[in-house]
């Protein structure tokens, strides 16, 4: 692996990794919203607020379903195939370790040789 964190070659496949990460985070947030709305619904006495929360709960469940279906269609999530999901989780863990081991802030970051003058020169 090229250890130069500014080299564009190190960004190969990053958009795909980012998409899966964002989708999983969105799914988790949608699930969290459904859970929090359900708790709020059980603790509300006002009929108007209960109706509003019930509507939000249904919308949250629909959003969760939509995100899940998108992830399944793109093969980013395998809720019914545990061995496939395990492989994805292992790959994710491997990538996390790889990024964690990258020297993202090397001692030498001087890129002065890449430019013919400093920014202050006109």
Swiss-Prot record:
Domain of life where this protein originates: Bacteria
GO biological process, one term: sporulation resulting in formation of a cellular spore
Keywords: Sporulation
InterPro entries hit by this protein: Ferritin-like, Spore_coat_CotF-like
Compartments (UniProt record): Spore coat
Main location: other
Pfam family, one: Coat_F
Gene3D superfamilies documented for this protein: 1.20.1260.10
Homology family: Belongs to the CotF family.
Protein name: Spore coat protein F-like protein YraF
Origin organism lineage: Bacteria, Bacillati, Bacillota, Bacilli, Bacillales
The gene coding this protein: yraF
């Amino acid at each position: 692996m090229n250890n130069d964190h500014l080299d564009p070659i190190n960004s190969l496949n990053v958009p795909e990794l980012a998409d899966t990460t964002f989708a999983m985070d969105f799914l988790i947030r949608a699930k969290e919203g459904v859970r929090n709305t359900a708790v709020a619904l059980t603790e509300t006495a006002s009929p108007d607020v209960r109706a509003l929360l019930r509507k939000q709960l249904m919308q949250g469940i629909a959003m969760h379903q939509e995100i899940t279906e998108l992830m399944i269609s793109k093969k980013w999530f395998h809720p019914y195939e545990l061995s496939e999901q395990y492989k994805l989780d292992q790959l994710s863990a491997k990538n996390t370790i790889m990024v964690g081991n990258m020297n993202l802030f090397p001692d030498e970051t001087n890129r002065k040789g890449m430019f013919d003058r400093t920014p202050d020169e006109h």
